[in-house]
Curated annotation (Swiss-Prot):
Residue stretches in coiled coil: none
Key word Membrane present: yes
Transmembrane segments: 12-32, 51-71
Organism taxonomic ancestry: Bacteria, Pseudomonadati, Spirochaetota, Spirochaetia, Spirochaetales
GO cellular component: plasma membrane
Single Gene Ontology MF annotation: sodium ion transmembrane transporter activity
Organism field: Treponema pallidum (strain Nichols)
Protein name: Uncharacterized protein TP_0055
Membrane topology category: Multi-pass membrane protein
Extent of the signal sequence: none
Gene Ontology biological-process entries: sodium ion export across plasma membrane
Alphabetical UniProt keywords: Cell membrane, Membrane, Transmembrane, Transmembrane helix
Pfam families linked to this entry: OAD_gamma
Annotated localization: Cell membrane
Amino acid sequence: MNQIRLFAQSALVSVMGMGMVFAFLLLLICVVRCVGALVSSFGWDRGPDEGVGAAVPAGGALAAAIAVAVHEKARSTS
């Protein structure tokens, strides 16, 4: 009976940890998109001779790099 309780507590802590990581990544993606929209609205992502924005791909690359780092950290601690 004690082993079942320990397993249930461990599973609950794991699910809560994954939920916290998911919420952090979701919040991070929202912040990066908002910053990208702000940069695009002010025109800071365009050079003098460029017609295409660069903030959105850069924000996506940043979000992907942070997601990989968080995933590696979570994998190394478990």
